[in-house]
């Protein structure tokens, strides 16, 4: 960012972008604050005897993900190249691999096009198909999972929680890692692809936090 002329800046991210944003917040003193829409933290074991309703739902979501929704992650983190050959060879296979996540992770009431337009869905698929990056994008999991750093983050942080997000965390769970959590909001609609699903709401969340810094 300094090479672009920004001596101070804010950063925002979700999914892998949340990991990158967190890294910026911990490794670059010029990053003054971070906002996340998928902050990954472990449940605080000290809260297990007095869980809130939200925390109970979050734990149920973790369990569902591990049992039914994490097959893609296990494949990409162990045998990404094997998967890549099939996806690079089949546009239908590539589309199915991507679009299933829009079905599962958007606030779509059973149909992805209720949350994201068909053109946007196909554009997302084409990013992988035209660039032939099914394998290399999958390898990100294989290359990164062993390097995950769950250490303390002292940078001022804001977190927005969407109901159809993959991982959700309560405010007190987040504060165990993000020790300067200044903004926490649980929204009524939206999912994992918040910027595509609810762009106005997404922008408002980012502005609401950074405006306070």
Label every model-predicted segment:
Residues 3-57:
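Conserved hydrolase catalytic core segment
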Residues 10-14, 58, 68, 83, ...:
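Generic detector of intrinsically disordered, low-complexity, polar/charged segments
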Residues 11, 18-19, 23, 33, ...:
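A sequence-composition feature that detects small, non-aromatic residues
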Residues 41-65, 161, 167-174:
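Membrane-interacting alpha-helical segments
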Residues 49-80, 150-152:
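The feature captures the conserved acid-bearing segment of alpha/beta-hydrolase catalytic domains
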Residues 76-213:
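C-terminal subdomain of alpha/beta-hydrolase-fold enzymes, centered on the catalytic histidine
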